[in-house]
Amino acid sequence: MRYIFLICFLPFFVFGDQLVYPLPKVVYNKQKAALGERLFLDPSLSKDSTVSCADCHSLSRYGVDNKEFSTGIGGAKGGVNSPTVYNAVFNFVQFWDGRAKTLKDQAKGPLLNKVEMGNTEKGVVAAVEKNRYYAVEFKKIYKDGVTFDNIADSIAEFEKTLITYNSKFDRYLMGDKSALTKTEQEGFGLFKGKGCISCHNGVNLGGNMFQKLGVTVEYKDPKSNLGRYDVTKNEEDKYIYKVPSLRNVEMTAPYFHNGLVGSLKDAIVLMGEHQLGVEFTKKELEKIEAFLKTLTGERPPRFVK
């Protein structure tokens, strides 16, 4: 398991540029992805045909619904903030507690979750088989046709296409030093120098390790969500979560697993206190926030409204 509890400031400041990378190209099956897109947008996969994957993960809203908790079938509310599906292919595990190892495993979860889409494997398969388009396409693409596993596979293949390329920061990393303003570059320097990059690194600036919320100052979650503990039942895993990606972070409020922080600036303050043990000055906050906004990339044009 990937845990990091020690923060070593100087090495991250000196070598920080080598810890973050521009988004790479991803190979995917176009036929499966096209089918998966239809399924992702289709509410008939839920028990009462009212909720689609896109209702909680709006593709025009950078893969979230901007709500504290999403609404499932019958108006039920979920227990954690819905993470973005954009760039999820680069996460080392899926969900806040890391219970799904792959996109395919993750795709199965909401379909069967009683609060979210509330269906069964047989129910999902039956809904898909009723649709003539689906029936024909599954026979073309999969030897065994419509199965629950194949449905999840096609949705996962579509999610591989949800990558937000061409952010200002990616252009900067690829050699265009004029892509960031002086303030944004200073914000990146603070991001490295203060230790943010110790957890938010790699191609996704996060999503590649677990971390405790409350490293330097204890964080008491009013929602009593126990994070990784819910999967492992190990006491040491309480309040440990997958570190979220910071890509498109300005667009994905509210923040954290409990959705309790509404502004990006407040999220930076909280992280400084509980994870780094630092209190940022007003100027530092402004610069770090300016840098984080350079991580906003471009959605596929058809999802821009």
Task: Name what the model sees in each region.
Residues Y3-F12:
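Sec-dependent N-terminal signal peptides
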